[in-house]
């Protein structure tokens, strides 16, 4: 019986790896060399898990930390360790997007300290360009606009957006109820603009969209009548960003980063932002103070009269 189970797990793993290869090649449009590098690094993890008797879909954070420690122990350079672990995290993000896993065991996986990288953030103008790129003449146009306005208005994780229910909407009070990590619920303010776009979407939704049984309460639907998936939202945003001429590497989570950064720049209290994002620790939210300082420095360098004078002098010489 154990032999049959092991064989089934192996077949499933082979299928997953094949789909991941296709995803890297076709969806991410990576070069053959980059795809090979991802696959080589992934094979290191698979070899480790096989030696430990762990199925890929049963992998825990502890398993990944054990694997990461092994990279250090055999003397792999910190930058190479970081590259390998980044590839591993990308693989588990794919498993989440493709609905193979509910949670991401690699989310809290830390690599070696090789420098601090700030998350990508969109400007208000860039967000407007992305939303304006939506074609409202298509069947999904109004739904897509409501999705983006909700992501930016509420700072939701993509999984929270996909699982949002009509019964969670309290428009008269200006709030929505969100179920976050660990099934923890929170109330999040929602903008009048997002409310308007969701109501417009409901007109379309009720005017011909088929809705499958048991999915009637979901806010955002796919064409086949079930709630929209994370990978669909991911591809939607990638497509719209390309159409809008945005070259930054963005994802649904970029809207969450932008939401928090713009609130902080507007003077919002860090604790209030923590509550809206559903962060357990204020330390997680403090990343946005780094972004704010980084942008502030860029503004000063760009507009300070001494810097302007220096740039002009350099142009003359």
Descriptions of predicted regions:
Residues 1-317:
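Conserved catalytic core of the tyrosine transesterase superfamily
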């Amino acid at each position: 019986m154990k032999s049959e189970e092991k064989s089934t797990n192996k077949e499933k793993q082979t299928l997953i790896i094949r789909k991941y290869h296709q995803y890297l090649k076709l969806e991410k449009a990576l070069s053959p060399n980059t795809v090979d590098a991802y696959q080589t690094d992934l094979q290191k993890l698979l070899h480790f898990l096989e030696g430990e008797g762990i199925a890929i879909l049963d992998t825990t954070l502890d398993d990944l930390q054990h694997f990461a420690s092994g990279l250090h122990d055999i003397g792999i350079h910190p930058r190479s360790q970081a590259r390998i672990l980044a590839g591993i995290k990308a693989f588990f993000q794919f498993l989440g997007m493709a609905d193979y896993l509910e949670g991401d065991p690699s989310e809290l996986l830390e690599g070696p300290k090789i420098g601090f990288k700030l998350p990508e953030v969109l400007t208000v103008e860039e967000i407007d360009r992305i939303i304006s790129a939506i074609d409202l003449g298509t069947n999904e146009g109004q739904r897509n606009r409501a999705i983006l306005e909700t992501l930016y208005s509420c700072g939701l994780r993509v999984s929270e957006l996909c699982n949002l229910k009509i019964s969670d909407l309290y428009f008269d009070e200006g709030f929505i109820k969100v179920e976050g990590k660990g099934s923890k619920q929170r109330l999040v303010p929602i903008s009048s603009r997002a409310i308007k776009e969701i109501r417009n979407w409901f007109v379309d939704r009720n005017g011909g969209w088929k809705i499958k049984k048991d999915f009637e309460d979901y806010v955002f639907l796919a064409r086949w009548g079930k709630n929209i998936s994370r990978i669909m939202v991911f591809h939607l945003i990638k497509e719209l960003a390309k159409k809008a001429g945005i070259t930054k590497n963005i994802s649904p989570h970029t809207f969450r980063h932008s939401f928090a950064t713009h609130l902080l720049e507007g003077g919002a209290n860090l604790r209030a932002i923590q509550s809206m994002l559903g962060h357990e620790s204020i330390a997680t939210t403090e990343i946005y103070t780094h972004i704010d300082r980084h942008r502030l420095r860029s503004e000063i360098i760009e507009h300070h009269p001494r810097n302007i004078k220096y740039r002009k002098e350099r142009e003359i010489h």
